[in-house]
Amino acid sequence: LTGCKSPSKIAAEKAGEKILEKAAGVKVDIDGEKMTVVGEDGTQMTMGGNEWPEDQMAKEIPKMGSGTVSYVLNSAEFCTIIINEVKEKDFEKYLTEVESAGFSAEKAEYSDDANSIYIAQNDKRISLQLNYEHKSEALSLAIVKESE
């Protein structure tokens, strides 16, 4: 039962959902650190959480096998993930996986003592940007579906 939420936590989440739904005119589902917003047109965006998302735009990129996910923003059009505790060798391995997954068109790379940046696109017109901060061992990943 240690994984169950307390009644007060459930009540607080439900109250927060109602306030946000009324203010924004959207459906809101709060589940601990994760919030899902569904617009009137059915579009969905998920924010928060500390797990790698496996749906919407996140399904278009390889899953990072190391580090600790600290932030997620995921929708059908874009995805941002921040991963901490990523060693440089793990970033380099992930970069190889991303390129092998097809993110190699329109490629631009930059690296200095502070950052390594990789920008590319795949054949589905999905653009990806990786920014690895060497000192903090943090990887910021962003993908967006380009409009046609």
Model feature map: region roles:
Residues 2-3:
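C-terminal motif of bacterial Sec signal peptides marking the signal peptidase cleavage site
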Residues 7-79, 146-148:
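Compositionally biased P/S/T/G-rich terminal and signal peptide-adjacent segments
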Residues 48-54, 99, 131-136:
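A short, sequence-level motif marking secondary-structure junctions
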Residues 67-72, 107, 129-132:
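Short amphipathic beta-strand and strand-loop transition segments with alternating hydrophobic
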Residues 76-81, 112-118:
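Surface-exposed aromatic
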Residues 78-86, 126:
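Second-shell loop/turn segments in exported
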Residues 85-106:
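Amphipathic alpha-helical segments
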Residues 117-145:
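Short, exposed beta-strand-loop hairpins at the edges of beta-sheets
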